[in-house]
């Protein structure tokens, strides 16, 4: 199922990127392009926490969420509906898929590498779509076929998913509420920083950097499993620090790789802080990428400072989690 969800992620982002790019190349003015891209990001990323919360409460609907995602994305490819309607449909379909897929991966696997693999493919699909290297209909046909397989397997019970019951008392033995909230805030703060520093590519390398984004996410998950998340935090800092010591394409690639290595780490630790709501926590992390999408040109922090701030947020969050992770959720 991980392979299927990863392919779904690739095709979903490809659909959205291709449709929006097809509109942009025929639009003469920049303002409407910026508006509709911004609206898409707002819906696709800003609604995930709410959809995640609803699916956490009604887990039996998660298979249907994939179908609704397929329908809305298919409708979003119809240009006759108008770009406003298309943008809304694409945002909803994208949000539904990400939350449903992310929730399943968080529930089924307890390690980091699966998360890294799942989130890695979207950047490549998005780049192919935005650069019109693949048609939206091609992406859609693949997404439809894969989604029907996923829905069938979920309905037939072929997927072993651990469904945790909600803690009615919200009591965390050995993990004080203030420590949990502090850990979540710090981890989400790191995601905000990644939105500003880990997703921008050089236009001359339209496919190189999306592949680096993907490689960083996979590598981050593997490192967390092999050497632990604490050592991975240090490794990310060292890679980032070393990349700032000289100029050129290679240092930029290394820095981009390091920033993206944080993604599976933050997603998993945020989920561990509130394991009863994987969909909502996944959505909260996704929503924290919005500031980078909207205010990147207005936000100026020297790379050295950003690297240090990222390291401090991860280090303190990791310390809080290590100190208080001897907790037991009262189910």
Regions found by a protein language model. Name each.
Residues 230-266:
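C-terminal transmembrane helical hairpin of 12-TM major facilitator-type secondary transporters
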Residues 62-78, 231-246:
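Structural signature of the two symmetry-related core transmembrane helices
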Residues 16-21, 171-217:
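Extracytoplasmic gate region of multi-pass secondary transporters
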